[in-house]
């Protein structure tokens, strides 16, 4: 009987956990500086180079990280050609800094998602390192 009760409790806990693809629209935008940079500051309109890792939000994961969907290095202009939350997340960073950014669907890919890797209504977690402002 105790075994059955334990199985039921465990099943209830697992069922209540967020999956990496569960819509998570109630999670707010937030940033956490993991390392504060000492170089020039990124402002809207700055051309920046960043290293990044991206995960789907999962409330049961370490640091709310679920499935990693992307990683790399790229250059862009803050406020142009990237999702709004990514631009907002890098604004105010200084070169050499690393920031964890939580992006709700409204500032990310919304109800459309992106390809096969980011489902509709996904909250995203990025860790971004500001490499340079050329």
Predicted regions and their residues:
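Cross-family detector of peptidyl-prolyl cis-trans isomerase
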Residues: 2-134
């Amino acid at each position: 009987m105790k075994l059955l009760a334990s199985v039921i409790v465990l099943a209830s806990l697992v069922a209540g956990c967020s999956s990496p693809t569960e819509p998570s629209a109630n999670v707010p935008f937030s940033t956490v500086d993991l390392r504060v940079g000492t170089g020039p500051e990124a402002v809207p309109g700055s051309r920046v180079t960043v290293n990044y890792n991206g995960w789907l939000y999962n409330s049961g994961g370490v640091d709310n990280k679920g499935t990693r969907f992307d990683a790399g290095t790229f250059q862009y202009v803050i406020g142009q050609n990237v999702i709004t939350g990514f631009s907002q997340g890098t604004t105010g960073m200084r070169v050499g800094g690393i920031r964890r950014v939580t992006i709700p669907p409204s500032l990310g890919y919304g109800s459309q998602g992106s390809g096969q890797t980011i489902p509709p209504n996904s909250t995203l977690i990025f860790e971004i390192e500001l490499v340079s402002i050329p």
